[in-house]
Amino acid sequence: MPEPDLHCLGGRGLGLHHHQRQQLKGWPDLWLVGDKPSPRARSAAMAPASPPPPPNQTLALSDGLLLRALACLPEPHLTGAASLVCRRWMRLAGRLRRRLAVRDWAFVTHRLPYRFPDLADLELFPASIAAPTALPHTSPLLTCGEVSLTLDPSADPPLGACRFLDDDVLDRGLTAVAASFPNLRRLSATAAAESGGLMAIACGCPTLQELELHRCTDLALRPVSAFAHLQILRIVAASPALYGTGEDGGVTDIGLTILAHGCKRLVKLELLGCEGSYDGIAAVGRCCAMLEELTIADHRMDGGWLAALAFCGNLKTLRLQGCSRIDDDPGPAEHLGACLTLESLQLKRCQLRDHRGLRALFLVCEGAREIQVQNCWGLEDDMFALAGLCRRVKFLSLEGCSLLTTRCLESVITLWSDLQSLEVVSCSKIKDEEISPALSELFSNLKELKWRPDNKSLLAASLVGTRMGKKGRVFFKRKILPAHQRIKGKMLNHSTGAAA
């Protein structure tokens, strides 16, 4: 028989050498048989056993029944508290999620299709921006919507050009999205130099209706023509200052012509920072016969593009946002034409200092029934007087027009016999005491009036119906309820009986 090992653990009267015991002192939770256990081990052994967790009552419910119950929850609870109950609830809540904004590109190619298999609205642009590695973690963030950019306080300017992921990484992610989400309806992504990713989206997502494409160039718009059912398109052109592209990047007449010939079912088109001229807008108007809403923001177009709006035969809404100029050279008025179907003209945060450009805009939109001017610069009396060229206006909204006076406003709106609604907000030079009897009569015939040109008018409007400004005894007169009257009567009867 083999000899017993004298150095084994647990033998009575047998032990380890002194140096071996010293080596085990670094393990406080390990003791030898025959030795005294540590105080921590004794307390753990003497502690009462924890009660078993209560049974999960939802295990008796099928996935289909639980999905119907979770579908009744509003979106914040569905994505928040319900997903934290257990793994099963997290998986089922992910199946009900329809919209998601991704911030980590690694999640796109790995866990996204398993965590949220039925997405219809996917925002990939925030995840396509590469995080800077050289900046410390305490650097401030600049957040705009779903996008957060890291600032470098030591640099001038602190916000440099955005650094995006490599084009092959973007293409692989878009290919994975196309293979996993065939029912995708809306997508926001970053255009790559190669067109493989967007072509995969066009082939794998046949029901895609809305596309938002950032860092666009003329070449990046080639695969957009493959989207057969695209109805809403938002293009953010590549800007050298923000995206770090070359001076020849961006969207010109070439890119506008490409998308016009490919996306003939467009209903809404938004162009941000795009170049181009008469030819590009004319191509969009000729080919996109269903176009109803056109938004042009911060454009860099050449002179003469306003005349091309006459080719948009079904256009109903024209919106200009953040434009430093309208049209430098609109050409003769007889060559401008007009949008006969236009219903709404909206100007937001635009420079309205060019008399020729603004006059050409109102001539093209002379049939507009709704005019909105919000926080625009340079809208003085002589500039706003050009709005009188539009004779069919039914709704006028002015907000933040601090240079406009009451007399000019009256001279324009009295020309509009069809005016039904008027909104004047934060126009400091429009005064209540300057309202003439004719203007008061016009106000009385309106169906809707929102009059808050300054703080004083805002206060006066807010006091209507509150009986504020009356004497204190009238305003603070207590309203006695029937129950109070009964209690008061009982108290009077009781006091009368006691006195008797």
Summary of predicted features, one role per range:
Residues 2-191, 195-240, 244-245, 260, ...:
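N-terminal adaptor-interaction module of cullin-RING ubiquitin ligase components
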Residues 2-37, 48-49, 131-167, 171, ...:
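C-terminal capping region of solenoid repeat domains
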Residues 271:
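Catalytic cores of nucleophile-dependent amide-cleaving enzymes
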